[in-house]
Amino acid sequence: MSDPAAEAQHVITQTPRPRPGLYTLHTDGGVVAPPGQAGGPAAVGAVLKNSANLLVEAISRRIGHVDDHHIAEFRALIEGLRMAKRHGVDKIRVFTDSELLVKGILEDIKLKSAEHRGLRDQARKLYASFLDQKLSWVPREMNTEADLLAGRALPIRPTRG
């Protein structure tokens, strides 16, 4: 007879089986910044859908104080990619309304702080770990679900960058 505790431990440590199909991930970060300031309380939103456009999981979470909205955008991407990995996704299309985020991941642009560079490196590593991936900029109007989720986690409406 097998030990149920040992079996439970085995299940917990298993790597998720890759899920077939192409998944989409929309991400957004928001910041409530006082007038004249770039930083403040921040939140992330992310929406993962399967190839049938059905919701797999969504995130709406405060992430504490950040120095600017770019940090919130990088954090949203990282949390969204981690969510996809937890679901065993290996083919993904990622959409964001942050041009700097797309350029930061796909191009060698200079970022202003060590925190930005560290988040970029972390996001790049996660992004590259997918078997098939594409990151694209979309207008804010095409990113409304992630935008609403990020905004919902904040005490007041976020600033836009």
Model-predicted regions and their roles:
Residues 30-36, 78-151, 156-158:
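RNase H catalytic domain
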Residues 1-24, 57-59, 87, 129, ...:
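Intrinsically disordered, low-complexity regions
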Residues 75:
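Active-site phosphate/pyrophosphate-handling residues
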Residues 12-71, 82-86:
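RNase H-like nuclease fold core
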